[in-house]
Amino acid sequence: MNIIAIMGPHGVFYKDEPIKELESALVAQGFQIIWPQNSVDLLKFIEHNPRICGVIFDWDEYSLDLCSDINQLNEYLPLYAFINTHSTMDVSVQDMRMALWFFEYALGQAEDIAIRMRQYTDEYLDNIIPPFTKALFTYVKERKYTFCTPGHMGGTAYQKSPVGCLFYDFFGGNTLKADVSISVTELGSLLDHTGPHLEAEEYIARTFGAEQSYIVTNGTSTSNKIVGMYAAPSGSTLLIDRNCHKSLAHLLMMNDVVPVWLKPTRNALGILGGIPRREFTRDSIEEKVAATTQAQWPVHAVITNSTYDGLLYNTDWIKQTLDVPSIHFDSAWVPYTHFHPIYQGKSGMSGERVAGKVIFETQSTHKMLAALSQASLIHIKGEYDEEAFNEAFMMHTTTSPSYPIVASVETAAAMLRGNPGKRLINRSVERALHFRKEVQRLREESDGWFFDIWQPPQVDEAECWPVAPGEEWHGFNDADADHMFLDPVKVTILTPGMDEQGNMSEEGIPAALVAKFLDERGIVVEKTGPYNLLFLFSIGIDKTKAMGLLRGLTEFKRSYDLNLRIKNMLPDLYAEDPDFYRNMRIQDLAQGIHKLIRKHDLPGLMLRAFDTLPEMIMTPHQAWQRQIKGEVETIALEQLVGRVSANMILPYPPGVPLLMPGEMLTKESRTVLDFLLMLCSVGQHYPGFETDIHGAKQDEDGVYRVRVLKMAG
């Protein structure tokens, strides 16, 4: 970062000459100089080039107005105002809090001024780099000799092998030098929360509005288990969202607890809804506890916020209403909610402490922010036993954590501080809103069909749109007022074939075809439903990527309307089974799958499958104990009714468990099996469209098989 912008005076000799001298002196200090044409040009430079590390300008011409505009973009950026002996200095105490320095126009002073600007630049960089990352950078620059782990010794070992050299050249020297051992004492300890690691966690807590934060280097799957192992002791009961991530199902297998399920809603599109308000009431919980063997009043609750499809809760209401001492919001998909006003009251860390309760929030920093994969955070607000919690933390944390991951978590937090962070999140929200409007415009202008978006009819302003009762667009029956809200950065595209109420048309385009078309053109969909596709507008999505997605959608429409051959339109799919797809065209394939979906009434089947829960014969923990003792056998999926599942069975999409370990399908919940068999049949009819079902495996004959507990006797 070495770019300085100069807004020089124009045509004034006694000002021009000192600035020309200064330019030469700054270049000698290693700076690169740019000359914006005017203040508008300058602000665009700063907005789109974060490597700018200073601005020089004439105070008489631009004064505080320019400073204020720059501060709206980056209040930390050094500003250098040049004045003469007659300049008016109307600067308040508040203005002096800016990173603003004054210099006089004078010949022969350029070298000294350039040295001072180098000093101020170094202070600026030192100020924006967070503590652990700063310490890691310093350590790498020191190039110390070590005789400890890791064995590649800062990348040296890779350069002793041809293939190692390829690896080194790809990842780069600094990445490998930053992969250091816990034996480096000056970097502190992640496990003991000392030194720069502790400073990083305190820095992150301040940034995210938490009282305490913990850095986790192996994903929110692990963060969820850490919280659960601390908050739900053996023999206790916990309330848990049936929409939970599979890591929480694994927690239930590890920990000897009794789950009581909070049952969420779904709409006909297969979009995951939230848990209705009535489920959080004391009366409802009492009924659930009474109906569950071994259950007591729950000590802990787990709620997925937001849902996979981008629905956020009114978390303030839940925190006040839910009568349990410990609440965990699994917010893996929304680590940005603290940094934009539209999300106020919709995150775990929002608001003040709640008397008598401790609130946990887990976030996948890597999912929607700028952190490396596996980067995760646990935030806490309320009283808790730090020593006991840290035992749970250490139980699930490697003694060789990745320091680049730690630095990336901290840097992700640093990127969100101040006006630069607000602007980063706001840009993401605005880009998603613009994309939504563009799809609407193309739909209105297109001949025939075009894609639609799952959203209210009018989306003029950026907000979290309420899923309000009585509105048709969302498709949720009996929606609660002021309870669920659609996140604008989670964009669900709808394909023709079915409306939000589940009414199916004669013809349709299953979303899986569109997903394959986009994938073959380098555009990866986050989630695919029967007639919907989910796209995430994270902070890394720029205008080019958004336009690329729009282009992909319009290209699909054009190719579909031309009824191109599968061989030409979807060559990768064609390669799956050339004989089957040899003469098939895209409209034949679309209508074939659409008719299969209509025949089996997939939307209705999906709703019924998730609405009727299987019978819990034993807890997931008890079922797991039986499995590791070898008391299991494998049967065909179609034989599952009446047998106790040994594993979690989870079709993707939608990625939510249908059957938990220890649960049994009965005559009442038979629809779960019908739904699974229907998903399997699509792949049997059309090669390349097989459904991924976690917990079920295909044998050599193509039969899906599952593990169940052996029957007694």
Where are these regions (language model features)?
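Extreme N-terminal starter segment of soluble prokaryotic enzymes
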Residues: M1-I3
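Short beta-alpha junction loops
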Residues: H10-V12, D60-E61, F82-M89, G108-Q109, ...
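Non-catalytic terminal extensions of PLP-dependent enzymes
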Residues: F13-G30, S39-F57, I70, Y76-L77, ...
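Short, structured coil segments at secondary-structure junctions
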Residues: Q29, E75, D95-M98, N255-D256, ...
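Conserved PLP-enzyme active-site core in the AAT-like
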Residues: P36-F45, D58, S68, T220-Q440
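A short, gly/pro- and small-residue-rich
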Residues: L64-S87, I378-I380
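Hydrophobic or amphipathic alpha-helical targeting/insertion segments
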Residues: Q72, Y80-R97, W101, Q109-A110, ...
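Long, structured ligand/cofactor-binding scaffold of large enzymes
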Residues: V163-M254, V260
